A protein has these predicted regions:
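Hydrophobic, membrane-interfacing alpha helices
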Residues: 1-276
Length: 276
């Protein structure tokens, strides 16, 4: 499969182009949401460089410390990166990890919000639907790279994987679950749910939409990891799956805290009337 083109001797990959389209789509939807909520949409574009830098750093670090099994078999391990530090900067060697991108981007947005006296919770709610949209689009980069595919499958929508991109133990198997497509659809459902809640449930406390994003996205990724062949094992545990379980748990706790526990703690206590 063709995965890019060459300009002046430099290879341009479709993966990078699609990622940028996802970023722009996410920013576009965030500006729409900001305007609808009465916030300044220009802040989105001021925030974007921060989120991009934080997201790329986080995504790269996630890959470095949780390389997939196929790369470990090739000797591309965490220790390899630590002993070849220049390779850490070579994002074409290895790749990026979405969990790290979300964490790094969120941390960068938090720093931006504190620095510019913005509400971090409000802005996470604003960008959450766009984040889901950007992830849905970005997953199509995996299609051109022929990666993030699932277990062997004969279903009508299964995809053909070139021999060069198959895991050694599946070298004779041609068709697989399109895991990237499943996650794309799941992210679009997440975006739809967040847009619906943002319009139909105005009583939700600030930060609640991002909590819903965490729960919905984390749940989908957790179960999709069961289909994934090229996992990232740490001490025999699929670290991506463990992380997503933690994300779901934190999302539930955050949602309950914001909408149930904190309002009760802030509710003024009624004092009994004094007898006369």
């Amino acid at each position: 499969m063709i995965n890019g083109f060459t300009i002046f001797g430099y290879k341009i990959y479709f993966y990078g182009i699609i990622l940028m389209l996802g970023v722009l789509a996410a920013a576009w939807l965030a500006t729409r949401e900001a305007k609808r909520r009465g916030w300044n949409p220009e802040v989105v574009w001021d925030m974007l460089p921060w989120a991009l830098v934080g997201g790329i750093i986080g995504a790269r670090l996630w890959h470095i410390f949780t390389p997939p099994a196929s790369m470990v078999e090739q000797g591309i391990t965490t220790m390899y990166y630590l002993t070849h530090p220049l390779q850490i900067l070579n994002v074409r060697n290895g790749g990026l990890g979405i969990p790290g991108a979300v964490m790094g981007g969120a941390l960068a947005v938090y720093i931006f919000a504190r620095k510019n006296k913005q509400s971090f919770g409000a802005w996470t709610d604003i960008v959450a639907p766009g984040l889901a949209l950007g992830q849905a689009i970005g997953r199509w980069g995996n299609f051109f790279n022929q990666e993030v595919y699932g277990a062997p499958s004969n279903l009508p929508w299964s995809i053909f994987i070139d021999a060069a991109h198959r895991l050694p133990e599946y070298s004779a198997v041609e068709r697989y679950h399109p895991l990237f497509l499943y996650e794309c659809v799941w992210n679009l459902l997440n975006m739809t749910l967040l847009l619906f809640l943002g319009r139909m449930k105005p009583g939700l406390k600030t930060g609640s939409l991002f909590a819903v994003y965490m729960i919905f996205y984390g749940t989908g990724r957790f179960f999709l990891e069961f289909l994934r062949l090229d996992i990232s094992p740490v001490a025999g545990i699929n670290i991506n799956q463990l992380f997503m379980a933690i994300v779901v748990g934190l999302g539930v706790l955050l949602l309950v805290w914001l909408n149930v526990i904190r309002p009760r703690l802030q509710k003024p206590q009624e004092t009994p009337a004094s007898a006369e």
